[in-house]
UniProtKB/Swiss-Prot annotation:
It catalyses: 5-[(5-phospho-1-deoxy-D-ribulos-1-ylimino)methylamino]-1-(5-phospho-beta-D-ribosyl)imidazole-4-carboxamide + L-glutamine = D-erythro-1-(imidazol-4-yl)glycerol 3-phosphate + 5-amino-1-(5-phospho-beta-D-ribosyl)imidazole-4-carboxamide + L-glutamate + H(+); L-glutamine + H2O = L-glutamate + NH4(+). This is Imidazole glycerol phosphate synthase subunit HisH. It comes from the Bacteria. Signal peptide: none annotated. Pathway: Amino-acid biosynthesis; L-histidine biosynthesis; L-histidine from 5-phospho-alpha-D-ribose 1-diphosphate: step 5/9. It is found in: Cytoplasm. CDD domains: GATase1_IGP_Synthase. One of its GO terms (biological process) is L-histidine biosynthetic process. Residues 2-216 form the Glutamine amidotransferase type-1 domain. Its EC number is 4.3.2.10, 3.5.1.2. Its main location: cytoplasm. IGPS catalyzes the conversion of PRFAR and glutamine to IGP, AICAR and glutamate. The HisH subunit catalyzes the hydrolysis of glutamine to glutamate and ammonia as part of the synthesis of IGP and AICAR. The resulting ammonia molecule is channeled to the active site of HisF. GO terms for molecular function: glutaminase activity; imidazoleglycerol-phosphate synthase activity; lyase activity.
C-alpha cells in the first residue's frame, strides 16, 4: 500500500509523515508513506492525505499552484473512490466555500461553508488551541476502538474557523467549544478531521491506523 501525503506548502508535513509511519509500524500494516507534490503520484496512490494549516485561501492557492493536483484529487477521490483523509484546513477544503476574510471556493465535496467560530461562552478564546474530547454523531470505522465522549481520549485542535455542514449526516463527530463544533466529517470514501491526528497521541495514532485499514 502506498499512502500519498500531499506536499503543497502547508501542513505539519514532517509530523504527519512520522505519525503515519509509526501507526503503520505499530499496527503491522505494510505501507509506504509518500510525501509528494507530484499529482501523478497522488493519482496512483492507494490512499490520499491532504494536510493543511493556516488560512483557507492560502491553502487553496497552494493546492491550485501544484500542477494538476486538483484534477488528480477529483479524479482519484470522486471517480476512483480511493480512501481520502483531510486534516485541519485539509478537511475544511473539502467544503464548498471558505468565508475567511474573503470568499474562496473549496473542493465542493462536502456541502457547507467554513465560518468563523463564535462560542456561546465569551470567555473561550479564539483560536481554540489545545486538547478537547470528541463526541461521535455517526459511527465510522475511523473511530473503531477509540474511546470518545465524556470519558474518552482527547484530540488536539488549533483553529479559528469551523466547517458548517449543510447535511447533518456528513458530520461524523463534534467537539464542545461553547457549542458544537464540527470535529470530523465524512461520506463514501472520504473523511476529514478538524483536529490533528498527528499531534493527538494515542487517539491520533489509532485513527490513522483505522484509516489505513479502512475499506470503504
Amino acid at each position: 500500500m502506498r499512502v500519498a501525503i500531499i506536499d503543497y506548502g502547508s501542513g505539519n508535513l514532517r509530523s504527519a509523515t512520522k505519525a503515519f509511519e509509526r501507526a503503520a509500524h505499530e499496527s503491522g500494516i505494510s505501507a509506504e508513506i509518500d510525501l509528494t507534490c507530484d499529482a501523478q503520484r497522488v493519482a496512483s496512490a492507494d490512499r490520499i492525505v491532504l494536510p493543511g494549516v493556516g488560512a483557507y485561501a492560502d491553502c487553496r492557492r497552494g493546492l491550485d499552484a501544484a500542477p494538476g493536483m486538483v484534477e488528480a484529487l477529483n479524479d482519484t477521490v470522486l471517480k476512483k473512490a480511493r480512501p481520502f483523509l483531510g486534516i485541519c484546513v485539509g478537511m475544511q477544503l473539502m467544503s464548498e466555500r471558505g468565508l475567511e476574510k474573503t470568499v474562496t471556493n473549496g473542493l465542493g465535496w462536502i456541502a457547507g461553508d467554513v465560518r468563523e467560530m463564535v462560542p456561546s461562552d465569551a470567555s473561550l478564546k479564539i483560536p481554540q488551541i489545545g486538547w478537547n474530547r470528541i463526541h461521535v454523531k455517526h459511527s465510522h470505522p475511523i473511530f473503531d476502538g477509540i474511546p470518545t465522549g465524556d470519558d474518552g481520549l482527547h484530540a488536539y485542535f488549533v483553529h479559528s474557523y469551523m466547517l458548517d455542514a449543510k447535511n447533518a449526516s456528513d458530520v461524523l463527530a463534534v467537539t464542545d467549544y461553547g457549542g458544537d463544533v464540527t470535529a470530523a466529517v465524512g461520506r463514501d470514501n472520504m473523511v476529514g478531521t478538524q483536529f490533528h491526528p498527528e499531534k493527538s497521541q494515542l487517539l491520533g495514532l489509532s485513527l490513522i491506523a483505522n484509516f489505513l485499514k479502512w475499506k470503504p
